[in-house]
Amino acid sequence: MPIRVPDELPAVNFLREENVFVMTTSRASGQEIRPLKVLILNLMPKKIETENQFLRLLSNSPLQVDIQLLRIDSRESRNTPAEHLNNFYCNFEDIQDQNFDGLIVTGAPLGLVEFNDVAYWPQIKQVLEWSKDHVTSTLFVCWAVQAALNILYGIPKQTRTEKLSGVYEHHILHPHALLTRGFDDSFLAPHSRYADFPAALIRDYTDLEILAETEEGDAYLFASKDKRIAFVTGHPEYDAQTLAQEFFRDVEAGLDPDVPYNYFPHNDPQNTPRASWRSHGNLLFTNWLNYYVYQITPYDLRHMNPTLD
């Protein structure tokens, strides 16, 4: 899928070097088709890196995807140039009267912060409430899953004693579910979180369908039956080096982190890690775009009624 982004976005050259089809706005304007409009609420500190990761996963289908980047934190960023944010990100006020086919809400390093202490917690709640009437399907990732479960279902914050970091095996529970179509019976995916997602808790509080979980009974992938919302508790978008960068950052900070599980060859941080989750990550996002967005969204977004009979 050619993703349509502003001509000057750094991800254009970065992804083209990987042979990813990126269509700039100037080129896309000559095609007489309606692209899918996908809004990405980027909550990660290193926004450019996160843009690259998600845009890579949104690029594997023949339809155009028109990407809009959203920010809700007005504080000065320590990790992303202000010029980049001003040039490529919109504020909520800019898009609140628009409709979108899809919304992705990224993770955030807020696992040990209480919800009400999050600087932009009111804005998160505002976006989720707005999305009910303005977005066909929303995909929540990692910390955003925990936030959405609290806002939408009243599930209290669940925090692990130790950070979960590494590459873990998961198994699918419903082999014919659309979101897991084409998945192997078991697959690997990276995690980096303090948030805890016991499958039993989600079943007790919600009517969400759990589609994949770990051998320990932690929910990994689940969704509403009407396909309006989907949740992935890990980080299928991560690059091969992302967990290593987080590990060495914590080492330098004197935090004495555990070596990420099942990640470095021979469990030795001096060895170069390899990504073992790329095919799963690509298939997950392709399925979401196809079955949860494209097949149920209206052609004319002005007539949005994002429900599935």
Swiss-Prot record:
Record site: Important for acyl-CoA specificity: G111
Compartments it resides in: Cytoplasm
Annotated metabolic or biological route of this protein: Amino-acid biosynthesis; L-methionine biosynthesis via de novo pathway; O-succinyl-L-homoserine from L-homoserine: step 1/1
A GO molecular-function annotation: homoserine O-acetyltransferase activity
UniProt-reported outcome of changing C142 to A/S: Lack of activity
Root EC class: transferase
Pfam families in alphabetical order: HTS (PF04204)
Reported impact of K46L: 6-fold increase in Km for L-homoserine and in Km for succinyl-CoA. Slight increase in catalytic activity
Entry keyword Acyltransferase: yes
Gene Ontology terms: biological process: L-methionine biosynthetic process from homoserine via O-succinyl-L-homoserine and cystathionine
Outcome of mutating K47R: 14-fold decrease in Km for L-homoserine. 72-fold decrease in catalytic activity
Effect ascribed to mutating Y238F: 5-fold increase in Km for L-homoserine
CDD domains for this protein: GATase1_HTS
Effect of K47L: 8-fold decrease in Km for L-homoserine and 10-fold increase in Km for succinyl-CoA. 20-fold decrease in catalytic activity
Record's function text: Transfers a succinyl group from succinyl-CoA to L-homoserine, forming succinyl-L-homoserine. Utilizes a ping-pong kinetic mechanism in which the succinyl group of succinyl-CoA is initially transferred to the enzyme to form a succinyl-enzyme intermediate before subsequent transfer to homoserine to form the final product, O-succinylhomoserine. Cannot use acetyl-CoA.
Name assigned to this protein: Homoserine O-succinyltransferase
